[in-house]
């Protein structure tokens, strides 16, 4: 997949999780921070997730934002929702994403909500299955969004007109 030029996008950042990790060494414990960040342009339907690790939180956040900008994806949005139901998996985390009627809102837990709102999806139903680890849930959501296809995409792949898809 081609890299997205993030300089032309109006990206908003959201810190999803800050995790203190330690390494036990001869002289005691070395503490560092692992941060997961979601960036997105809700107007254009772009979203990305990144992780950063550093001795200080601000450095870890900066690294995570840089990483997220390198991993942007375009999300297919139909009206205010997603084109079809999908399950995203990452590690032990599974996230079910279902399209919803207009006016439903984003029915999702914290980490999943951050990704969907950053992508510009306004109406969707979700269910977290498996791991409740914030980082795994965020990456599972991204995997689900990567699997989405519009009717036009499916018709093009099959080499048939869109009208023939629904017969």
From Swiss-Prot:
UniProt KW keywords: Ribonucleoprotein, Ribosomal protein, RNA-binding, rRNA-binding
GO biological process, alphabetically ordered: translation
The keyword rRNA-binding is annotated on this UniProt entry: yes
Pfam family, one: Ribosomal_S5_C
GO molecular function, one term: rRNA binding
Annotated S5 DRBM domain residues: 11-75
GO CC terms: small ribosomal subunit
Subunit record text: Part of the 30S ribosomal subunit. Contacts proteins S4 and S8.
Sequence similarity: Belongs to the universal ribosomal protein uS5 family.
NCBIfam families noted in UniProt: rpsE_bact (TIGR01021)
Function: With S4 and S12 plays an important role in translational accuracy. Located at the back of the 30S subunit body where it stabilizes the conformation of the head with respect to the body.
Comment field on protein domains: The N-terminal domain interacts with the head of the 30S subunit; the C-terminal domain interacts with the body and contacts protein S4. The interaction surface between S4 and S5 is involved in control of translational fidelity.
PANTHER family recorded: MITOCHONDRIAL RIBOSOMAL PROTEIN S5
HAMAP family hit by this protein: Ribosomal_uS5_B
Listed name of the protein: Small ribosomal subunit protein uS5
Organism whose genome encodes this protein: Thermoanaerobacter pseudethanolicus (strain ATCC 33223 / 39E)
């Amino acid at each position: 997949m081609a890299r997205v030029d993030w300089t032309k996008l109006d990206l908003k950042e959201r810190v999803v999780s800050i995790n203190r990790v330690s390494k036990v060494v001869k002289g005691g414990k070395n503490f560092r921070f692992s941060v997961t960040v979601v960036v997105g342009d809700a107007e254009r339907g772009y979203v990305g997730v990144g992780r950063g690790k550093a001795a200080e939180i601000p450095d870890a956040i900066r690294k995570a934002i840089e990483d997220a900008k390198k991993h942007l994806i375009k999300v297919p949005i139909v009206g205010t929702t997603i084109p079809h139901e999908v399950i995203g998996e990452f590690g032990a985390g599974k996230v079910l994403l279902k399209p919803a009627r207009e006016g439903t809102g984003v029915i999702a837990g914290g980490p999943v909500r951050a990704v969907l709102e950053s992508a510009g999806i306004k109406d969707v139903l979700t269910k977290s299955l498996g791991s409740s680890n914030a980082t795994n849930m965020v990456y599972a959501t991204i995997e689900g969004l990567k699997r989405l296809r519009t009717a036009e995409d499916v018709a093009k792949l099959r080499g048939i007109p869109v009208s023939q898809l629904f017969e």
